[in-house]
């Protein structure tokens, strides 16, 4: 399986982005035990452009984790574009865009 220029083998094992789970220590452990590619925790595009420190910390990656992906999520196109520019500075191998997060309002409560 290939994603862009990254060859992950025939049956790759991918670590999904999980809030408060896929921190650097967990990602390195997963790589040690055979993950072909890992994700950081998913990151809110709104939090990134507002420079929320917890969001920025999620962009920290090391060479030992590669290939590594960062997923940003949001609903506003302009915000996602600005967040993607911020993520580019972290130099992930893959930038995963998630526009699928629904907005829950009072009608759904």
Residue ranges of each PLM-predicted region?
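An anion-binding catalytic pocket shared by soluble metabolic enzymes
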Residues: 15
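Short connector loops/turns at beta-strand edges and beta->alpha or beta->beta junctions
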Residues: 100-104
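Glycine-rich, positively charged N-terminal anion/phosphate-binding segment
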Residues: 2-4, 9, 18-93
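Charged active-site motifs of nucleotide-sugar-dependent glycosyltransferases
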Residues: 12
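Conserved small/polar residues in nucleotide/adenosyl-binding loops
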Residues: 107-109
């Amino acid at each position: 399986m290939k994603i862009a220029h990254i060859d992950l083998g025939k049956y790759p094992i991918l670590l999904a982005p999980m809030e408060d789970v896929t921190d650097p220590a967990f990602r390195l452990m997963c790589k040690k035990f055979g993950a072909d590619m890992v994700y950081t925790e998913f990151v809110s595009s709104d939090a990134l452009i507002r420079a929320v420190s917890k969001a920025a910390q999620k962009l920290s990656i090391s060479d030992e984790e590669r290939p590594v992906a960062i997923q940003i999520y949001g609903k506003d196109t302009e915000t996602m574009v600005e967040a993607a520019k911020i993520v580019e500075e972290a130099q992930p191998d893959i930038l995963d865009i998630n526009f699928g997060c629904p907005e829950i309002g009072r009608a759904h409560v």
